[in-house]
């Protein structure tokens, strides 16, 4: 199990070890740590057979033809905002799960889900900084909001208006701050008020 092959693209195409065009130190690191098969070509080439597309780029980067050539029942996170890499209505019938950064479609993935809770949790314990353990705690808290029996293709992440999210994130972030040693306030004996 686990991710075995990640292929990233930029405006030039696939990022791979040995590529010389439009590279910098970040892309060099990426090339050395992903794309083990050194896939080359455009985004349309490398998305063929892919299980997941995670877009963080620009509107219209992929189309329904690309979705048809992905693996069966692909997952598409088209995060460009306000216009995603592919519009959800264009993906209907071609994907198992679709998510965007937009509030007017199901499965909005937005950092507003984590920030109120992260800040509250950090402030509750007077954390000296926000570290990776606290960020992971926030992500896990968000993931745990939806019960397994509630999950379905249009409900993989809680709404930004779900009041449970900030409280759950704050509690888990505060715990992680104590466990990772960045809390500067003694842990309260009773639950910290939200």
Predicted regions and their residues:
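Short acidic, glycine/serine/threonine-rich loops at helix termini
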Residues: 1, 17-22, 65-67, 87-92, ...
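Short glycine/threonine-rich loop-to-helix capping motif typified by GTGT followed
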Residues: 1, 59, 67, 163-168
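Glycine-rich phosphate/diphosphate-binding loop of Rossmann-like nucleotide-binding domains
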Residues: 1-58
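Secondary-structure transition/capping motifs at alpha-helix termini
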Residues: 2-6, 70-73, 94, 98
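Long hydrophobic segments that form regular secondary structure
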Residues: 39-93
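Adenosine-phosphate binding glycine-rich loop
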Residues: 78-187
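Long, charged amphipathic helices and adjacent flexible linkers at domain junctions
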Residues: 187-194
